[in-house]
A protein has these predicted regions:
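Extracellular/surface-exposed low-complexity segments
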Residues: 1-91, 174-176, 181-183, 199-203
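Hydrophobic beta-strand segments of well-ordered beta-sheets in folded domains
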Residues: 100, 178-179, 197, 266
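Surface-exposed loop/turn positions within long extracellular repeat scaffolds
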Residues: 1-3, 9-10, 21, 26, ...
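Short, contiguous hydrophobic alpha-helices characteristic of membrane insertion segments
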Residues: 77, 99-107, 197-199
Length: 266
């Protein structure tokens, strides 16, 4: 019974059906213009939401899907614009080959809550904070890019991405989640939180210190992780079947507290 009490999550990925099980639909599409360019195609239809106060399921007519069309500086930007909670949540399904950018004020947060997101472009966090409110909230993103003074909170959810590109001064908080990187990347910012960090392919170059990272790090057979700071992998366990490089020949690194387990192929 969702007519009262607290609802966890968001109804954006639910479909509205009639008594016979038929999906109710009356969709329209609209171009979304940014700086004079068509950056996305929006689909509007009947939809369910959990309300601003998470106090039930509500029927409305609104945005149900975003099809990303552009990349780089022309990408669609999401901005909290002073809103919080569900008012700053994007629950519509995000698809397409374009990039998805975020550019809020430093203390503001945009959340994503549709587990059916499957966009393949870059997730470009240019300003503010991003909160994952579902598994695969970042779709099938090819890269997670965090600028200085930005933050991504995985909030206990799972995500697979191509590369990580975290600038110095950024924070990626795994926060009980599970992050898999298939193509490595560069982490010059802070990695924090518990959970799991899996590098299944490519080279991940970790140059920043991450003393608050307690997650288990797993290096797959086809992956390489290069560590340039004693606190790069925090205090979590490191399991490696691939290649783990600690510093350089003339500047070796001793992991501060991590336990390293090496398998036969590691």
């Amino acid at each position: 019974d969702a007519s009262s009490g607290i609802v966890k999550g968001n109804g954006g990925s639910l479909q509205l059906q009639d008594a016979s099980g038929q999906v109710l639909s009356s969709s329209t599409q609209q171009h979304i213009i940014r700086l004079g360019k068509n950056v996305a195609k929006g689909t509007y239809d009947y939809r369910l939401t959990s309300g601003v106060n998470n106090d039930g399921l509500y029927i409305g007519y609104g945005l149900t899907q975003l099809d990303l069309l552009t990349s780089g500086t022309d990408a669609l930007e999401l901005d909290a614009n002073g809103k919080t909670g569900n008012a700053a949540d994007m629950s519509a399904r995000i698809t397409g080959t374009g990039d998805l950018a975020f550019n809020s004020q430093k203390d503001e947060t945009v959340s994503l809550s549709n587990q059916n997101n499957d966009y393949t472009g870059v997730t470009d966090i240019r300003g503010g904070n991003v909160l994952m409110n579902s598994d695969s909230a970042l779709g099938q993103t090819s890269e997670i890019r965090l600028a200085t003074d930005t933050r991504l909170d995985m909030n206990g959810h799972s995500q697979t991405a191509g590369k990580l590109n975290g600038a110095a001064g950024s924070v990626l908080n795994i926060n009980g989640g599970n992050l898999t990187l298939t193509e490595g990347g560069v982490s010059a910012g802070i990695l924090s939180g518990n959970g799991a960090l899996n590098v299944s392919g490519g080279v991940l170059d970790i140059t920043g210190a991450s003393s608050a990272l307690t997650a288990t790090t797993t290096v797959g057979e086809k992956a390489t992780v290069k560590v340039h700071d004693n606190d790069a992998l925090g205090t979590g366990t490191v399991n490696t079947a691939g290649t783990l490089i600690l510093g350089k020949t003339d500047s070796p690194v001793m992991l501060a507290s991590s336990q390293v387990n090496i398998t036969e192929n590691g």
